[in-house]
Amino acid sequence: MYQDVNEVDNQELTNDIVTVSKLQVGLRIRADQIQEGLIHLVEQVGSNNMDELFTLLQQVASLLLDYSTFWSHVLASSQTVGSRQVAETLFNQLSLQERTKLTKDALVHAMQDGRKGGGGVLDNSNTYVVVTLLLGTADDQPIFGEIYSGSLLRDTLQDISMMRSRYLMAFDLIWNPQLSTDKLTETDMTTDYGDMVAIA
């Protein structure tokens, strides 16, 4: 006998089981449109209520799909935990870990510009932007597995964009570098994002 779909949904939404997921997409990119696009999307969010955050999540997933030709690296992890308190702690740890990289890389790049006399033009042939999506959802199992290919990443982003809104409990969007005038170098990718894998 199969459980009614609504009954399963209600169990997932009311129990203490939470899935915390991180999806990172690295883009080898010459233009600055994706950073400007992300800034624009965030500016449209008037508050941190879940409806607006869910809309932001859908829009970011769609934007990343639009830039699929620039995908270079990916990292995916989705972990289910047995309590909301543990999930919140894990989510905050992941967020802090990623946001710490923003300050570090911005400082390093500023020092490099200073040594060069400032105003230098980046060689964009091997520069990157990394976009990180952190999600806390009411799912009772991981929402995706490991991702190594562009096709799997595309499917995952499409699934995220079609997620049921009531399942979203937390969402954090982080991209590095924050400014459209800055990019990550090969060295930055190796140092700070060495666990990401090249997309096959």
Task: Indicate where each model-derived feature is located.
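Long, contiguous hydrophobic alpha-helical segments, chiefly transmembrane helices and signal peptides
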Residues: 25, 56, 76, 91, ...
